[in-house]
Amino acid sequence: MSDPFSEAQHQLDALGLRCPEPVMMVRKSVRKMAQGETLLIIADDPATTRDIPSFCEFMDHKLLASQTDSTPYQYLIQKGL
């Protein structure tokens, strides 16, 4: 089985940042992307386990994969409309 995180077109390192900085950085990064492109987010703030999925739902992006069992957490999102 292939690693979905290795297929990301863009990457955002949010290690060491605390809420609300990771989501603010995700929003800024996604704005620069084309529809359908993917972003890998690497973070260690426990709040991202709640904030990243909520951000995706609210902004109509797809959360393609997540790894939140241990740090660093990883999220793969696809830009929506």
Curated annotation (Swiss-Prot):
It is found in: Cytoplasm. One of its GO terms (molecular function) is sulfur carrier activity. Disulfide bonds: none annotated. Pfam families: TusA (PF01206). GO terms for biological process: tRNA wobble position uridine thiolation. It comes from the Bacteria. GO terms for cellular component: cytoplasm. Sulfur carrier protein which probably makes part of a sulfur-relay system. This is Sulfur carrier protein TusA. It comes from Shewanella sediminis (strain HAW-EB3).
